[in-house]
């Protein structure tokens, strides 16, 4: 849906209205809430956190007409950042989350600060170089089926090759 609307003609304002009419904007708050519900499931929590963090960060960084994500509810965003902080506090090891977070934080730390990111989270994000993902082999198939997170990282890594 987003791809077809992006290809459409019109000003950014018109594209924004098209996305609004499509109902796409209304779906992302529910998607992020569904990820939040998975935070307590040991088998799904790690991926749910990565996807939710990405969506919170991306919604703060890119205009809705570019990302397809309208502003998310503050309470939902805070719940995501609180869970991320809790994982860091518990010392959960996740190299992929580390280099993803370093990139997000380097590109837009304010998105984390806005929703209650702590100094502990800042230290964690800064422990990996901002461009640390460039030194990691990111297999394209590891990004498949991961929604906007996968599409974003696929495009970013393709541009780096």
Language-model regions: role of each:
Residues 1-16, 41-66, 92-110, 133-138, ...:
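Amphipathic alpha-helical repeat scaffolds of TPR domains
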Residues 19-34, 69-82:
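Helix-turn-helix repeat elements of alpha-solenoid scaffolds
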Residues 21-43, 47-48, 52-54:
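Non-catalytic substrate-recognition and accessory regions of acyl/acetyltransferase enzymes
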Residues 31-34, 83, 117-124:
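Alpha-helical solenoid repeat scaffolds, predominantly canonical TPR units
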Residues 36-43, 87-93, 127-129:
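Solenoid-like repeat scaffolds
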Residues 64-72, 112-116:
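Short, flexible/disordered intra-domain loops and linkers
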Residues 72-77, 116-135:
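TPR/TPR-like (Sel1-like) alpha-helical repeat modules
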Residues 159-161:
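Alpha-helical solenoid scaffolds in eukaryotic macromolecular assemblies
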